[in-house]
């Protein structure tokens, strides 16, 4: 029989051919700026667990916050028939996301009106962080934010954080960071900012 021959020959099915026939790969791509960053590392962990539970595999892409790399990954996803994209980066023009013939969900940033976006509970996060600072009796806090637009709600986290500290008598210096920094550069830059602002 066919099944007996399969066992005897130790036949391994060609999954790519199967996927082409079914028009389904059971792969979901997660595109992030830097998976070594603690935030993205934890997000990736839980997305992978949830996908696996539903018989999907995760295809992880790191862009390094570069436009060309994000574009290359998205092109590769289209060519390799992933079933969808979870987008944690947003370096490209709105039209490039709109023209994707794939299901796409954006994370914490509205890339286009018609693309669904999942947002963090930023107000709650800002309050939790501020309460932890207050509980530990910190005297001087540097609240570093990136330049944000109306497409990103993360500014709400920083706003609630800063307001809560100031209401509770904690010195909070709000600093807007105008350039993108890679994860490995953050600690060095933070030390410089602390020396400049919190030692006075």
Give the predicted meaning of each segment:
Residues 51-62, 142, 158, 162-187:
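Short beta-strand elements in bilobed, periplasmic/extracellular small-molecule ligand-binding domains
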Residues 118-143, 156-159, 184-194:
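Hydrophobic alpha-helical segments within soluble ligand-binding/sensing domains
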Residues 88-131, 148:
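Flexible loop/hinge segments that line or gate small-molecule binding clefts
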